[in-house]
Amino acid sequence: MAEKPGLRLQSIFDEGHFIHEKWQRWFQEMGTLYGKWYCLDCDEYFWGGADCHDGPLEYCEVPLFYEPLRIYGHADGWLVNLGDPLMLEIKSIGIGTIRYEANELIGIHNGDMEKIWADIKAPFMKHIQQVQIYMKLAELLGFENAPQEAVIIYENKATQDAKEFVVPKSDFSIAEKFEAAAMIIEAVNNNEAPPCNIRLGGCSKCGGYSE
C-alpha cells in the first residue's frame, strides 16, 4: 500500500486541487466548460457542455486516450462559446514550481516571489508541450472542432494573482515523442527491443534485453 503523504505535502496537493476546481466552477457558471460529466443522481457519464444533462453534474475534465500509441492525457478543461475552442490547463505557481521549471529566476530575483512572478512573461516549456500533446490527442481521436489553441492559466499560490497565455497548436515540439511512441509500439508488437537511443548498436544498458 502506498504511504500516505505528510500533512504539508497533502496540504500542497489539496491547494492545487482547490485552485483547479475554482477555475473550472467559474467556467461552468459562464456556460463555457465542455468535456466529460458525471451525474450524481443517475450514475451516468455524459459528454458536452454543463447543460448536456439535467441533474447535479460533477466535472470529470477531458480524458484523452489514443489506444494505437498507448498515449493518455487528461486536460483540465475544454472551453467553448468564447470564440474558437480552447484546451484549458490550470497551474498553481509557487516557489517549488519555479525551482523546477525556471530555477534561474530564483537567482536573478534573490528568491523574491513577487519579482519572480512579475518576470514570468510566457508559459514554461513543459507546460507548452503538455497542452500540445493534449491538442494532438484530441485531433487523433477525431473530436469534432478539436481545439487549435490552448489557454494556460497560472495562479500565484501566495497572492491569487493570475496570468493567462494562449498557445497555438503546433506539432513541432512533440512530433519526436509521438514518433518514439510509434517505434516502441512496433517493437513490442514484434517482440523486439526498441533501438537504443543512447548509442548506435546498443549501450551497456541494452545487454539485459538480449539475454
What do these predicted ranges mean?
Residues 42, 100-102, 109-110, 118-128, ...:
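Metal-dependent nuclease catalytic regions and adjoining charged, substrate-binding loops involved
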